[in-house]
Amino acid sequence: METYEHVGNLQVATKLITFIEQRALPGTGIKKDDFWSGVQQIITELMPENKMLLAKREEIQATIDAWHQKNKGPIDFSAYHSFLEEIGYLEPIPEHVTITTENVDDEIAAQAGPQLVVPVNNARYAINAANARWGSLYDALYGSNVISEEDGCEKTGTYNPKRGTKVIQFAKDFLDHTFPLTSGSHHEAINYAIMDKQLVVTLESGKMTRLKDETQFVGYQGSQGDPSVILLLHHGLHVEIQIDARHPIGKSDRAKVKDIVLESALTTIMDCEDSVAAVDAEDKVAVYQNWLGLMKGTLEATFTKEGKTKKRKLNEDRSYTAPNGETFSLPGRSLMFVRNVGHLMTTPVIRTQSGEEVPEGILDGIVTSLIAKHDLLQNGTFRNSKKGSVYIVKPKMHGSEEVAFANRLFNRIEDILGLERHTLKIGVMDEERRTSLNLKACIEKVKERVVFINTGFLDRTGDEIHTSMEAGPMIRKGDMKSSSWLSAYERSNVAAGLTCGFQGRAQIGKGMWAMPDLMNEMMEQKGTQLEAGANTAWVPSPTAATLHAIHYHRHHVPAIQKTLADDQTCYRKEILEIPLAGSTDWTNEDIQAELNNNAQGILGYVVRWVEQGIGCSKVPDIHNTALMEDRATLRISSQHMANWLRHGIVSKEQVIRTMERMAKVVDEQNAGDPAYRPMADNLEQSVAFQAALELVLKGTEQPSGYTEPILHRRRLEFKQKIAKELV
């Protein structure tokens, strides 16, 4: 049972009070009474507006539902457009918007590179992600399917030299392409040395050569005659050639190269939202404790692997000698953002005097900013932001009014924490239809603090389906990726960012590669996101970050953005094209395949969320391909099933039968997990199964199609069930 203490007119969970007063506040210069007084003021001022914005969402949705019910058949675009303008769904487009954000770190403003998103409540994942600033290309290639396992190149229990040869060949091809020599190849190199402030490479023939572009050599470790690391720079990203004649790999290399290490995940989003299951004070404090450990540089994780105990901690900065003899260092860790939750959910961690839960997004904003003040004051082992900023990603906002509300919240947080105005920077997730259609107006509301806009295909598709739920049955889920609205949405996001002056000042991001085991496919496809104008894109693992970094060497992002900067196209008409099925004459087999795929993904994710508190995991799909699943993937799958159910493509009985059958499949896929509770043994008593079923059967009733209300309630129900079993 949660215990609370009265703090002013608030009831605050004892666990949070203890954490704030004993861990988070000391060293910030803020007195506890002043802090809690400020929290009370913010909640009193902003909670009513938060509620009003959510009520407006529901009012708009009900109005749109009614319009579609009244206007059946093919949509009259002109009438539809006028209707959306009348109800304020489509806002006036501001003519000129230029962002003026100051004190933005180079990883955001100057460099282009991969971005990781990781659940902050998992210390090991969070540390691995922060440390993924640098990654071994040899390891990434050897352990992934980028290198084929054909012709004796299998990944075996011990090192496979034949596979290793292919890895080294790929890596040295990368060096030749990215850092070409005036003559010869890195494959022919037998020695790297520094002479007269230049990198000199000796080839097998005895000939000495240099880099075609000598400015690419920027530093080294060791001595000039016998360096242990050569540091190179291309397209703003660093690459290390690591040399060690005693290393097993270096020993067999002509030039004694043991590895090639790439600057990889420039930025990491430490997530409190979609990849996290945090439903009570214990969970929220665990989230905040890890964020504090990251900000102070003290976070550690101990785990057992192959029978051995291993420890992870944050990496130190990397020191080098410049060609002119001066020493310098580069960050050893990603620049960290923190993603707060959106405006929807409330939390039992703080209640009002009348017992009402307070908005979780307000609490996240206050506590994560308080914790980040330690970085601003340089209280930690390392510095996250060298420019004195705090980077907060704000998700799931609908239209400019909600973005303006987030801005006011940030203003008030800065006031109570004693921070200069616009210290708190905002990343705006463009993942809701009303934001996509009004993105320029949204940017205008935060033009002095925005550092990031990002498209999110999955959440955005979930909102696309829910908004137009009453319009008719949607196309199959797999066909969404080639739909016209989605292409326009992606192009519109880039155009808005560049028109508003993001180049050289802020990130324009693209979405996640969701198949962490299919790295060769990622290498073939993900470069298109940079060709489309993004200067960062999401990856699911440190390995993926290192491999995706190669795309930023292949594509010069600033030059691409320059060619796209004049795009003044208004994409509204295309974005408003609802992805309705022109014909619903799918075969029974096609319909069942769609149901099976959706049901299996829903159950595979929900069972871990509800019964293990895991908010992000690799979930095998119907074809046993491992997919990174979080609440965004759950939203699209549950809304798609709910849409087909609503329009009679499938029946309620068919949905239930499919879910029951797929529960057995998911049970089999999880058979090796000792913590797993099978669903199919007792479907009525399985909290996870009932949650998954509810997400579909009551999908049309969920606010904007979000899954959080059901997940949170069912997770708390399961926790209470376990507590009773232990008594």
Swiss-Prot record:
Q: What is this protein called?
A: Malate synthase G
Q: Matching Gene3D superfamilies, A to Z?
A: Malate synthase, domain 3, Malate synthase, domain III
Catalytic center residues: R339, D630
Name the InterPro entries on file. Answer: Malate_synth_C_sf (IPR044856), Malate_synth_sf (IPR011076), Malate_synthase_TIM (IPR001465), Malate_synthG (IPR006253), MS_C (IPR048355), MS_N (IPR048356), MS_N_TIM-barrel_dom (IPR046363), MSG_insertion (IPR048357)
Q: Which residues form a coiled coil?
A: none
Entry similarity comment: Belongs to the malate synthase family. GlcB subfamily.
Required co-factors: Mg(2+)
Spell out which residues are annotated as carrying Cysteine sulfenic acid (-SOH): C616
Q: In which pathway does it act?
A: Carbohydrate metabolism; glyoxylate cycle; (S)-malate from isocitrate: step 2/2
Oligomer and partners = Monomer.
Catalysed reaction, written as an equation? glyoxylate + acetyl-CoA + H2O = (S)-malate + CoA + H(+)
**Which HAMAP family does the protein's record reference?**
Malate_synth_G
**Which terms are listed as keywords in the entry?**
Cytoplasm, Glyoxylate bypass, Magnesium, Metal-binding, Oxidation, Transferase, Tricarboxylic acid cycle
Q: Which NCBIfam families match?
A: malate_syn_G (TIGR01345), PRK02999.1 (NF002825)
What domain of life is recorded for the organism? Answer: Bacteria
One annotated GO molecular function: malate synthase activity
The enzyme's E.C. designation: 2.3.3.9
User: In the UniProt record, what gene is named as encoding this protein?
Assistant: glcB
Q: Which residues bind Mg(2+)?
A: E431, D459
- The entry's glyoxylate-binding residues are R339, E431, G456, F457, L458, D459
